[in-house]
Amino acid sequence: MGIDLIAGGKSKKTKRTAPKSDDVYLKLLVKLYRFLVRRSNSNFNAVILKRLFMSKVNKAPLSLSRLVEFMTGKDDKIAVLVGTITDDLRVHEIPAMKVTALRFTERARARIEKAGGECLTFDQLALRAPLGQNTVLLRGPKNSREAVKHFGPAPGVPHSNTKPYVRHKGRKFEKARGKRKSRGFKV
C-alpha cells in the first residue's frame, strides 16, 4: 500500500490562512492587516498577520515583569505583543510605556495607565505605525505552560526532568522511589 499523491507530488505542509476563531473583532483586525500587508512592503505587518492566525497556545501571554525587562532603554518605542499582557505582583514600579496587545488583564491595564503609559489596540497601532516604525515586537514564553512540563524523555530515565503524570501526591506514590520495593527499588 502506498500513499495517494496529489498530482504534482507530495502534499505540502499546511499553514493557516485565516484564524480558526469566530471572534468578529479578530476578523476585523485580520482584514485591516491583510490590507496593510498587500499595500505596504513591510515585513512587520506580515508577521503581525501571521500571528493573528495562530492558535491560543501559540499566542502566549507576557507578564509585566518581562515586558519591563524587554523595554528597558527603549522608552520612545512601542511594545507590540499578539497576545495578552498579564499583571505581575513581583514588580513594584513600572516605567511609562506604550504597549499594543490583543488583550490586557484588568490590573495590568490599570498599572500601565497609572504609570503614565498607554495601552493601545492594533487598529490604533496601524494608524500610528503603519509600517511598524519604532516598535519592539515581543512574544510570550510558549513553553512555560503546565502541559509542556510533562513533555520530553520519560520521567524516571536518567537525566530526565520531565514531570510525571501522578494520580495522587500521597506518601507511597512517586515520592517513594528508592524507599520501597514496589516503587522501583529499595535501598
UniProtKB/Swiss-Prot annotation:
Signal peptide: none annotated. The keyword DNA-binding does not apply. Residues 150-187 are annotated as: Disordered. One of its GO terms (molecular function) is structural constituent of ribosome. Residues 165-187 have a biased composition (Basic residues). GO terms for biological process: translation. Pfam families: Ribosomal_L18. It comes from the Eukaryota. The keyword Ribonucleoprotein applies. Keywords: Ribonucleoprotein, Ribosomal protein. Coiled coil: none annotated. One of its GO terms (cellular component) is plastid. InterPro entries: Ribosomal_eL18, Ribosomal_uL15/eL18, Ribosomal_uL15/eL18_sf. Belongs to the eukaryotic ribosomal protein eL18 family. This is Large ribosomal subunit protein eL18x. It comes from Arabidopsis thaliana. The gene is RPL18C.
